[in-house]
Amino acid sequence: MALIVQKYGGTSVGTLDRIRNVAARLKRTRDAGNQVVAVVSAMSGITDGLIKMARELTENPSERELDVLLATGEQQSIALVAMALQEMGMDAVSITGRQAGIFTTGSHTRGRILNMDPSLMRGFLDDGKTLVVAGFQGITPNGMIHTLGRGGSDLTAIAVAAALKADVCQILTDVDGVYTCDPRVVPNARKLPEISYDEMLEMASSGSKVMQSRSVEFAKKFGVIFEVRSSLNDNPGTLVLEEHPNMENVVIRGISIERSQARVTITGIPDEPGMSGRILGAIGEAEINLDMIVSNIAPAGLARHSFTMHSSDLGKAQAALKPVIAELGPNAKVETEGGIAKLSAVGIGMRSHSGVAATMFKALGAAGINIGMISTSEIKIAVTVDETLIEEAARAVHDAFGLDRSPQSGIGWVAQDG
């Protein structure tokens, strides 16, 4: 008897008919002789609706109270799924994050899983019950309700699978796997049978809507192999697992794009120790996530720093940098640029193959697309381009690496589903 963890997002449980479909799928899995644990998100639109109500009451709602409020969304959906299962004759029980033994730490609305006590879940499973667990939530050691932030239900599913030593973990969504690129941008993108943790992490940090990176990090840390697949059919999806030697045969696993980026360039920085720390420290204190960072020294001995961020953080970054720039001297100034996007090519085969950057840059040049910034890691090459050209850029690079020609040519994109 296998123990299977299945995660269903908000779209999958967005209506009562969809809840019945989820229950029917869980019943089929159980009837096949398996133990089943479902991890469920709030119904589609519920979380946003709760946030809207809170902000209508107050411009700055307490994050503690937001956690208490938002946790009710998942409690609604798990109860409804359990009821649907019971109507089908199954012995099902819903449990909250607290009852599941998910202990968290960190800030309210952005909790991190600290540890787990799966004893209650094990007891229910030993009694033959099917479990429906609330995603997105846990409890602090001192008893406060915590939500896990964006992608929290995926993280819950991975953590539950690790704690219970599940045989299978499935992330079920409304598309059928991970693709070489967003099929809405590249129509000939292909579904991948598998992808490594490291490639998935790079894709997650580069704009791919597959999963949040911390869910993949958690899976890698605890060795949880999981599958991204459709909740609408039984077709195989995409396995996410530790890399193996055959994976290096594919140079590029896939292409990701990230829109709504902005670039900040600081010029005239004294070339002295500690300058970078002061600048980036101010950005960090403002809780702004930076992406690409490029530094160089001008002939006059003054440094130049450029970095990218989400365009929504641009105003906050300018405010945070204002006092720092004033301290750097009369030559220092800040320039900003919006309307850019990031294109990334990812693949562990880069470690053992040369010429990847040349192929990518030639493809962009042939398409008449100018490159702004360039950033590389061991398994990723990323560039910025004009945001209006990002889709054309993605298609050009996708074609240049032939990602449409083999089902093993790449990784990529999947819709976020709660």
Label every PLM stretch briefly.
Residues 34, 90, 224, 288, ...:
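Short phosphate-binding/catalytic loops that engage adenosine nucleotides
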Residues 168-172, 226-228, 291, 372-373:
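Short hydrophobic alpha-helical runs that function as membrane-insertion/retention elements
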Residues 219:
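Acidic-aromatic/histidine active-site loop/patch
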Residues 40-48, 179, 228-246, 301-302, ...:
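Terminal amphipathic helices with adjacent charged low-complexity linkers/tails
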Residues 1-216, 385-386, 405, 411-418:
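Nucleotide/pyrophosphate-binding catalytic subdomain
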Residues 237-418:
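A conserved regulatory-domain signal marking ACT and ACT-like small-molecule sensing domains
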